[in-house]
Amino acid sequence: MATYGMANERLRALEEIEREIAAILLNAGNVILELSKEKPNERVLDKQATQFTASVQRVESELSGQIRYLTQVATGQPHEGSSYSARKDGTMALNRIDYARVKLAELSRTCDQMLEQP
């Protein structure tokens, strides 16, 4: 039964990560909306940028922890067949993290450029 409790806890953590990603996207949308105004409010933009950065760091940290856990579980168990699927899933997760980092960096650069414009 303890296995189900641990699995449920992991699923809850992933759901929380998903909610945090949704908040990141909402935050990015708010920044873009604010930047589209004729006279953007710098205080609002600074607050949004701070929230955005903090959320991205939390997601990155939590996802890294989840991936570390999956790696330990996949390699710490006696051989029960092919580990190809687990390796593929891990690789795909890392690729998604890298892609998210690239897109977030692009968004950050765009926000910085918009803030620098007179």
UniProtKB/Swiss-Prot annotation:
Similarity comment text for this entry: Belongs to the Mediator complex subunit 11 family.
Subunit structure: Component of the Mediator complex.
Gene Ontology cellular component terms for the protein in this record: mediator complex
UniProt record, GO biological process: regulation of transcription by RNA polymerase II
Cell compartment(s), UniProt: Nucleus
Top-level taxonomic group: Eukaryota
Protein name: Mediator of RNA polymerase II transcription subunit 11
Pfam family, one: Med11
Alphabetized InterPro entries for the sequence: Mediator_Med11
Keywords: Activator, Nucleus, Transcription, Transcription regulation
Biological function: Component of the Mediator complex, a coactivator involved in the regulated transcription of nearly all RNA polymerase II-dependent genes. Mediator functions as a bridge to convey information from gene-specific regulatory proteins to the basal RNA polymerase II transcription machinery. Mediator is recruited to promoters by direct interactions with regulatory proteins and serves as a scaffold for the assembly of a functional pre-initiation complex with RNA polymerase II and the general transcription factors.
GO molecular-function term, one example from the UniProt record: transcription coregulator activity
